[in-house]
Amino acid sequence: MIYSIIICAGALLGLWILEKLLAPKDTRPPLPPGPWRKPIIGNLSDFPPKGTPEWLFWAKHQERYGPMSSLEVMGQTIIMINDAQLGIEIMHKKSALSQMIPDAPFAHMAGWGMSLATERNRQAWKTIRANMKQEIGTRRAISTFHPKMEIGIRRFLLRTLDNPDDLRFHIRKEANAFMMDVAYGYTIAPHGKDELYDLTQQSVRQFSHIFSPGEWSVNFFPILRYVPSWFPGASFQIKAAEYKRTIERMTMVPYLWIKDQVARGCSRPSILLRLLQKGHYESGSHQEQVLVWTNAEFVMGGSDTTVSAVSSFFVAMALYPEVQRKAREELDRVVGPTTLATFEHRLQLPFIDALVKEVFRWHPASPLGAPHITQEDQIWDGYLLPKGALLLPNIWTFTHDPSVYHDPMVFKPERFLEGKDSPPETDPMKFVFGFGRRICPGRFVTDEKLFLIACHAVSCFFISPKDPGAPEPDWLPGVISQPGAFDLNVVPRSPAHEELIRSIETDHPWKNADATDISRFMARNQMI
């Protein structure tokens, strides 16, 4: 057996050498520099080890190779872009030349084939994007949801006041509660178990795993999708089946629940209901899948980036008390010490606005941006970006470039304010949410929610590390990155501020939750 393997390997190596010797000389410009390609597998062994923050690993390419570098895996060229201006030129200004979505076999196996990250049916992709743009793609559209945001954020303050040690849980719950209310008209359980909320959280965690770069061998060797699950090394088949069951339930349960409500005459306003009433959707049709995935994208896309940004904000406030003090001083001066700011105050709060930008710059929610595929050969700075190459922007290097941002590792909102002798530094909103037609459609949700949470949290709480000597936390690897464990003290500024936080209980008492109804619906339809 071993001799057969050696003979096969030798034959493949011989064919590879023969191909290189006999191939006609390529007169095109060279690819961007990069690590040496090994025969057959190329740079497969040059990907970051598991558990390594991918953006830091690839940032080393900028040090070694400059603003662009290249790799190759099984014939697939990968171009790492480590310079913000280059990224804007290639993927935004020339977005029509690189708007294709990379193939992701594992994501399709795991049931995510209709996601905006993978959907290659151009019409379906355009429909989902258009629906999202209409509902949440502009600040004007988002403004219709401001009252819901304000109530949800005040409830977040109350949860944090009552149980500050569970801050991360409260951040996640608030983010998902808002998106599920907007998308489905669904009210989550304020306390206790909620099947639909749990299902959404499970899907978000699986999303990060599914799309983690270099995680799945089947993405490099698509033929492996046909290997049975019992075959050695094919455990990805079992994972794919598990993830597929989760996402099918997460997308279909709220859709069927709303259809059931319509039939019973008790439906509530929601994005899904509005879209459902616009047309007829046959059960199991492609149009129905486009509809349910539109709303799945609303919920997951608008919540995970918000959780990351808000978590980073709280860490920054604990690590940089002087920034927290300046933000509080501005709020007390402009809004009042015991009054909560509203969205209408934003233009009067330049330091808070700069603070929001600095959160996005300091640690982008998605440190590696969404990949693009080139649709034709392109030449940049004397290097070839061949047709079909995968473009991968390292957003973290964009936001930590010392030639663009002074002291990039330091959290400093003042960098975005007009100075006597210096103009504001580059607004990170130009690239932290992606480029061109693949820009994050939920970016305004995250931006506006972070603004109001920052205002309310700084107005009402003192935020500090439990251990004053604790180092800055590590940020966890993944498509959406969040800070690692970092214990905080979050305490009310005064009894008056505690009373202000608790006023939500009388201003907007908890509504009846839908958790019991959805659990009964799922049990009745055997969806648990």
Swiss-Prot record:
Its EC number is 1.14.14.117. CDD domains: CYP64-like (cd11065). It is an enzyme of class 1 (oxidoreductase). Pathway: Mycotoxin biosynthesis; aflatoxin biosynthesis. Transmembrane segments: none annotated. InterPro entries: Cyt_P450, Cyt_P450_CS, Cyt_P450_E_grp-I, Cyt_P450_sf, Cytochrome_P450_fung. One of its GO terms (molecular function) is heme binding. Pfam families: p450 (PF00067). Its cofactor is heme. Heme binds at C440. It catalyses: 8-O-methylsterigmatocystin + 2 reduced [NADPH--hemoprotein reductase] + 2 O2 = aflatoxin B1 + methanol + 2 oxidized [NADPH--hemoprotein reductase] + CO2 + H2O + 2 H(+); 8-O-methyldihydrosterigmatocystin + 2 reduced [NADPH--hemoprotein reductase] + 2 O2 = aflatoxin B2 + methanol + 2 oxidized [NADPH--hemoprotein reductase] + CO2 + H2O + 2 H(+). Keywords: Heme, Iron, Metal-binding, Monooxygenase, Oxidoreductase. PANTHER family: P450, PUTATIVE (EUROFUNG)-RELATED (PTHR46300:SF7), P450, PUTATIVE (EUROFUNG)-RELATED-RELATED (PTHR46300). Converts O-methylsterigmatocystin (OMST) to aflatoxin B1 and converts dihydro-O-methylsterigmatocystin (DHOMST) to aflatoxin B2 in the aflatoxin biosynthesis pathway. Belongs to the cytochrome P450 family. This is O-methylsterigmatocystin oxidoreductase.
